[in-house]
Structures are given as C-alpha cells and as structure tokens.
Amino acid sequence: MAGPGAWKRLKSLLRKDDAPLFLNDTSAFDFLDEVSDEGLSRFNKLRVVVADDDSEAPERPVNGAHPALQADDDSLLDQELPLTNSQLSLKMDPCDNCSKRRELLKQRKVKTRLTIAAVLYLLFMIGELVGGYMANSLAIMTDALHMLTDLSAIILTLLALWLSSKSPTRRFTFGFHRLEVLSAMISVMLVYVLMGFLLYEAMQRTIHMNYEINGDVMLITAAVGVAVNVIMGFLLNQSGHHHSHAHSHSLPSNSPSMVSSGHSHGQDSLAVRAAFVHALGDLVQSVGVLIAAYIIRFKPEYKIADPICTYIFSLLVAFTTLRIIWDTVVIILEGVPSHLNVDYIKESLMKIEDVYSVEDLNIWSLTSGKATAIVHMQLIPGSSSKWEEVQSKAKHLLLNTFGMYKCTVQLQSYRQEATRTCANCQSSST
C-alpha cells in the first residue's frame, strides 16, 4: 500500500512549510555559525569588562594599599572628601572682607535709625517751639530745648560714626572707633547741663508763682509730643538685639561668659543706646507735660504741677544715664566687656590640643561691640610643627565663639625658668 510513503511525503511538506516559523523562534540562539572570529573576540572582551574578570583587575600595589576605585562624575559629586588642616582653617576663620562687610551693615543700620530720629526731632522741635510760645508754657519750651540738645547729640553721633569708618592712620593705628564713645559722653553731659537748667527754672516757678499758661494749647502740644516720643522709643529701642547672635551661639546658655540676665550689651551700639535714653527722657517729660497740661486746663490754680513734673523728670534721666556712663568709663579705662569672662576664655584656650599654659590674656574694647584680645600661650615641647594649627584654633575660638573684633595670638614652646644670672637680682637676693 502506498499509505506509508504518502504519509512520509506529507510530513516532509509540513516541515518545509513550518521551517520559517522555527527559524524565527531560534534565530537568536543560532548566532555562532554566522559570527566571525573577530566579532566573537570583541564580544568576549566586552563580557570580560562587564563581568569584572580578575584577569583585567588592576594590580594591588606593592605596599599593600588598596587600589583607588575609579568613580564616575556623579559619585565624585556625592562624596564628601576630607579637608586638610589649611582648608579647615580657611573654612572656619572669617576673612577680613566678611568682618568688614558685617561691620558696614551694622553701621548702616545705626545710621538709618539715627537719621530718621534726627528728622523727627527737627520737625517736632519746631512744632514745640511754636506751641510753647503760643501757650506761654515753660515746660513745653524746655522740652523743645531738650529736643534741640538731643538733635545736636544725634548729629554729633552720626559724625562720629562717619569718622570711625575711616581707615587707621600712622598716628591713630586703631582708627577712630573711640569717637563714638566720646560723642556718647558729650551727649550725656549735655543732658546733665539741661537737667541743671530745668531744675533752676522749676525752683524759680515754685518760689514766685508769677506765670500764666494757656492750658488748651499746652494740652494739644503735649499730646502730640507723647505720640512722637513713643515712636522715637520704638525706633531706637534695642531690647530685641541684646542677645549675642552668631558670635556666641556655640556657648552653652549657662556659660559664665554671658551676663546673668542672659543678655549681652556687647553687641549694642552705644550711640543708639544714648539716643534711646534721650528719647526716654523726652517721653517722660512729655507725659509729665501732658499731665500738667490736663491739670492746668481744668484746674488753673494747680499750675505748680508744671515744675513738679520737671523734678520727677530730672531724677528719671539721672537714673537712666548711669549705665551709659559706666559702660563709657569701662571702655575708656580699657576694662573687660561685661558680657565676657576672662577665666572662662582661658579655660577654653587651655582645652586646645598641645597648649601647655596661657601666660597672658588681655581683653578690652575699642568701642561698644568691638572687643579686642591679645593672648600669649606656651605649647608643650616638640609641638612646633602644630603651631599654625593651634594658632588657627585659638583665633577661631576668640573671633567666632567669643565674638572678638580683633585678636593677636602669640605662641612659644614651654621652657622651664632658667637660673637668674642678672647681677642685680643675685645681689638683691643675698
């Protein structure tokens, strides 16, 4: 029967028809028969790199150090490479440009406040002179005279701030920072001179009682004066800036270098504080004048209230100026600023590595907020190679942590005291 032969021929036909289907499914695996030797070698080399074969790995150095791994650009950007000591010192210590920029910003704020205050004083002083003349009120005229004194003091302070920004000269090597202190002293002395004049006039009115006052004009002028002096008080108040900022944030809150109240007056401007005391005295006097005007307006027979307010004003101004006088005296006598503790600073310097002792530490203020230090330290023997590092750490501690304006660090190796060879010393000891 031709059945088996026909079946074989049918199967062969089916294979030929299905061959392309099987070829498509297996073509991805049958590449070895068509790839040349050169292409195969290239593929094998690629496979070696991807598989990180040991034959292509870099050789280990003879000294046993680990080979440096080749990293791509992204991994290098993500890495935090260790900095050298010189790089750390450059990163930690502020440069002169940064210090000058901060100082210019601080002076610009002070000048802005004082300029606005001077304009307000000038405008209201003219208004008080007119109102006092119309009301025949000695209290208002005296208040206008007080504002004239305050205006002259602020102008003097602005002049001092302008001169203090000038570069040092051969004669004044520290610059003109102390002019701000001088202007603060002069303004306080002007307040005391005015206080004496007010007390004298008040006593004359108390004794003679031969004056008449227009209560209506006095009341209106005094009310405007209170409003203006309240604005001046908010403008010149520095109570929100008494805390040490970036210079002392690393110190603990109970650090001995801080004032007991937690505030530091070292960052204030003495000129603005003096102007604030003037504004406070003006406010007290304006309130007193307002009370006196109210009494005189409705009870003219009690016009003695005018000199009584002058007495109270004099006592309050004397009390408020005592702190400025004390701070000014400390600066002139080159005392340590009240917000710094010499013993605590010495302890902090002694904690620096390789420091044997702190021989001398002198701290004073050029002006308010500009503390200066000179320190002489001895290092342990054999640490001469670390002098630059120790000096950098000491300067960083004084400038950044304790907020010094300038500092000088002197280093030397520790040496035991040698036997005295001076003839005078030996003769005196015998």
From Swiss-Prot:
Q: Which SUPFAM superfamilies match?
A: Cation efflux protein transmembrane domain-like
State a single Gene Ontology molecular function: metal ion binding
- Region annotated Disordered, chain positions: 245-265
Induction per UniProt is: No change in response to zinc deprivation.
Q: Which GO terms describe its biological process?
A: lactation; response to toxic substance; response to vitamin A; response to zinc ion; zinc export across plasma membrane; zinc ion import into lysosome; zinc ion transmembrane transport; zinc ion transport
Renumbered to this chain, region (Zinc binding) spans 240-265
Q: What does this protein do?
A: Probable proton-coupled zinc ion antiporter mediating zinc import from cytoplasm potentially into the endocytic compartment. Controls zinc deposition in milk.
User: What protein does this entry describe?
Assistant: Probable proton-coupled zinc antiporter SLC30A4
Q: In which organism is this protein found? A: Rattus norvegicus (Rat)
Q: Which gene encodes it?
A: Slc30a4
